[in-house]
């Protein structure tokens, strides 16, 4: 495989992300469950892969990436615990303030793990995920997502990024490419959240009730975009988190949920947004017993 031109591409080091969710029995991260569903083993969450990009994005755009930047990725290949991967970002023009570039991740053998865009400011073109044709499904054909409709609210709550948990993840090697800003002083004052922690903030509690309505099933991240509106997201600071369904999708093996979520501070200032595509595996759901039996 050819080496990227350093004048055109910023390449990160090869890293071996850990599957820190392998202990969650019955999830896609559990070896036994994932193997039963046709995967090579328990998968590393796509949000974990996002943590390899900030050093490249700070080199590309400066600290401003954490203030008005985005990272928009569609996941193409599920990796397993410790499998080596490398992040790349197209090098922007010097001094770019409203710019968008290509971002991607591969294995050392050249398998594409994720692809999309990274930006700062307000570039003219849409991000990788906002440029996709979502092709909504016929709701009457859905089983796992039958209780949801585009426009539905996913909730309104307060949540925060746990600074102690983030520091523990760093010390245990669970945050693949840590910045000093995640555990100590940053250009904005105190510690800030890594991309995977921003995803957790805008996903975990917000999806708790909708997941109950879906019934037993196994899901995985299909695509994630985080965008800082007035960032960064600080550790140990409470944010109001809201979200809504954008679209529902259907394929032979999955039902898909596209949703947007938002974090605002106590003053009502938008801090960060996320667009996520969640894949629900039909073979894992009692709603699709025929598929599971096949």
Question: What function would you assign to each model-found segment?
Answer:
Residues 70-75, 223-230, 245:
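Short structured motifs
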Residues 2-68, 123-223, 285-294:
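Hot-dog-fold acyl-thioester-processing enzymes
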């Amino acid at each position: 495989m050819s080496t990227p031109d350093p004048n055109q591409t910023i390449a990160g080091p090869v890293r071996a992300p850990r599957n820190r969710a392998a202990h969650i029995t019955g999830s896609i991260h559990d070896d036994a469950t994932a193997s039963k569903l046709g995967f090579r083993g328990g998968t590393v969450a796509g949000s974990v892969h996002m943590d390899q990009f900030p050093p490249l994005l700070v080199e590309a755009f400066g600290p401003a990436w954490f203030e008005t930047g985005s990272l928009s990725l569609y996941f193409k290949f599920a990796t397993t615990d410790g499998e080596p991967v490398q992040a790349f970002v197209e090098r922007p023009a010097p001094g770019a303030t409203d710019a968008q570039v290509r971002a991607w991740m591969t294995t050392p053998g050249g398998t594409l793990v994720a692809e999309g865009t990274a930006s700062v400011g307000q570039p003219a073109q849409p991000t990788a995920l906002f440029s996709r044709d979502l092709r909504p499904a016929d709701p009457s054909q859905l089983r796992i997502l039958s209780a949801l409709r585009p426009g539905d609210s996913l909730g309104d709550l307060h949540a925060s990024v746990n600074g102690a948990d983030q520091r523990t993840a760093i010390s245990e090697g669970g945050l693949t490419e840590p910045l000093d800003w995640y555990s100590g002083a940053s250009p904005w004052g105190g510690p800030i959240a890594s991309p995977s922690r921003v995803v957790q903030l805008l996903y975990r509690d917000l999806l708790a009730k909708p997941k109950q309505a879906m019934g037993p099933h196994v899901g995985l991240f299909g695509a994630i975009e985080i965008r800082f509106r007035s960032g960064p997201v600080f550790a140990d600071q409470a944010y109001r988190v809201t979200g809504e369904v954008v679209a529902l999708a259907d394929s032979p093996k999955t039902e898909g949920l596209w949703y947007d979520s938002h974090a605002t501070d106590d003053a009502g200032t938008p801090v960060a947004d996320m667009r996520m595509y969640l894949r629900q595996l039909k073979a894992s759901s009692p709603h699709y017993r025929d598929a599971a039996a096949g």
